[in-house]
């Protein structure tokens, strides 16, 4: 089943160039010196939090985002990425609060809706997660990610007919996405619809996916 991965790069540009851990640590050292001179600089704090995230220092990043939000309680970048960091640290209630606050200000932001739905799933609030994913599809009917997220949730709930519909919609929007095809095939295999599963995999191969990349699912076919 396809896992919808939430990557902390979707609201503001957080540095597109790859850096080594040493380079990130060096960046932090420089930013700390700059913050000593300009402690009220929101831009510097956001940059330091970015470096903290890239080093997996989520507590430090949360601290920086919290300082930003004390200065600007509607700073969307700080709100969104603090929610992301809380999720990484399994502070799910706090992540939920940040996502909900973010969406109050910016209600049409797909990744924040998906982030909130993910947190609701982690909190075991299945009905609330379903409602949030339904909202995603209504707000973003042209997003394959919205359909895929709902399909993944439905698959977990063993609502296979509903999941198949959503995997089909996701594939309609991204027909060459091999992970979507594999996810649909996985559901068909669970339903013991072997022929349909094989056809789904074969279609993915025709779209250009190497057969070896789908070996795991081909091996499950009877």
Residue ranges and their predicted role:
Residues 42-43, 76-77, 110-111, 144-145, ...:
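Helix-start (N-cap) detector for alpha-helical repeat units in TPR-like alpha-solenoids
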Residues 4-13:
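Sec-dependent N-terminal signal peptides
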Residues 31-36, 69, 103, 137, ...:
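A conserved position within tetratricopeptide repeats
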